[in-house]
């Protein structure tokens, strides 16, 4: 046997006791105001109060709780405590921000969602025709809360009191306007998040109930409309529908009332807005938009790896002709994120060199080169307008490549020789190579002797240098830009010098990709350090005669002028750096022993040899050089992870490593 009006009667009695100070066991102090209340009611409504009372259970000092008046104002708490006892919140433009802040502090999730929804929509509620119509609206809203608990509504007491005290005519306009006004709210909410399948099923049922609710509320049958909706709130339907009201509140005038029809136990999952009648069509259009955006992103991602002018014959395995064309800055093609080096292979195709498959999709671009490839304003004038034609064959004797050993000599003043090695076989197509003997760009097979057997793909050519193979890394590649390259090993051709110009086409990314391709293909076993391109707009040219450590008066001129073969005007270089005097050098002996550190004149006397960036202290310069070399001297003693900066190691040891260590502790210690 059920007593449907029992819960409403209990809360009415509790509210009466609170207002008259009867049987209250706690006092909430907000500023200079005191609010008497019951612990059980506060704990049932707010997890904040539940935590306070449960921790200090039995402590008599917790009878008086003081709240921060800067966070919770007295007016806002008065409205919230009225809502706890009556499920009615007086919300308007004047107090919505105070109520939102106080509800967030007290963990009243349903009130927070209601306030956010009110601030988002900024829709002023319609004014009720009379106070009695407003009171009748409040009673009907509270009846929904009781129906969700699986109880039938008491019709005798409510209908008799309403019919004896109030006419039902004023209710029609106010109630119909308040119900009709809720329809635009869910339309805006729909575009904020994608809802799950369960929510869609619930909202479809809510929309049907809303239609019946609007049709049932008429002037002739105001209280009877409540009974006609009883069938939607049977205990069976409650398993599917947990929020039959579309908004969980009734919007009134600026000082109107918001009625919370949710049971107090389910406040954590309460969602204020729901779906309107057009839910199916809106969800379908939303899903279509999401799918279209995903397809567009996928197409754009694939398109960014397409080559600009590919002329690669797939069937020509023994002899492939790759044409790399320099495009102006205002090129209409969308592939602006990848430099021209990556255009040697299409997005789905790959170029096989000595058994190492280097796919364009797997090439890792350094961030500096990819950002400067098309964003540099000088890139349109720095590019060489001619077409660089490469003759790429599987015959290793006919292929001139820039081996890593060219850039990793131990003596800085020596000449660097071009050699053949399987460690690095990607020729540099982005630099302007000027051959002294009027040779074509980047030696073709006719440039060298045709003698010698051709090695099969995947074979390893013996290193002509006397250095061990493990010295083929760690040295920065940019330090030898502009040094004369002498062709010595295996070739009897003429000598040629190369002046590298920073043409804005990702010069350094070509070397880093060449180093990356070999370890991924398994052709070489040296470690891989990712190189970061220097930030200087022009790659510097350093002559061996200028690096003499003995002559203190000799000046190291960082010549940044760009040379072109076809008579283009040279670009002005960066400010020239002058080598420090003998007095300064004598005071900076420690810096002279450091690799890649240069002592120059001026206040910032420590310069990076790779990119010519100057620093005030030697420590800062050494930290910067690690960006180029990829060194990580600082290791974590707990997990073994290495870092290039000591600050990174400190942050790791205080945060990430502690979490990793705590996750491995036995559960008994936690």
Curated annotation (Swiss-Prot):
Alphabetical list of Gene3D superfamilies matching this protein: Classic Zinc Finger, Potassium Channel Kv1.1, Chain A
Keyword entries, A-Z: DNA-binding, Isopeptide bond, Metal-binding, Nucleus, Phosphoprotein, Repeat, Transcription, Transcription regulation, Ubl conjugation, Zinc, Zinc-finger
Modified residues (Phosphoserine): 234, 366
Glycyl lysine isopeptide (Lys-Gly) (interchain with G-Cter in SUMO2) crosslink location in chain: 239, 317, 325, 399, 410, 535, 587, 590, 638, 651
Chain ranges of zinc fingers (C2H2-type): 606-628, 634-657
Disordered: region residues: 158-256, 268-382, 414-433, 442-470
Record flagged with keyword Repeat: yes
GO cellular component assignments: nucleus
Comp. bias regions, Basic and acidic residues: 361-374
Entry keyword annotation includes Methyltransferase: no
Residues in BTB domain copies: 24-93
Highest taxon of the lineage: Eukaryota
Function: May be involved in transcriptional regulation.
PANTHER family recorded: AGAP004733-PA, ZINC FINGER PROTEIN 37-LIKE
This protein's name: Zinc finger and BTB domain-containing protein 5
Organism: Mus musculus (Mouse)
Lineage, broadest ranks: Eukaryota, Metazoa, Chordata, Craniata, Vertebrata
Gene transcribed to yield this protein: Zbtb5
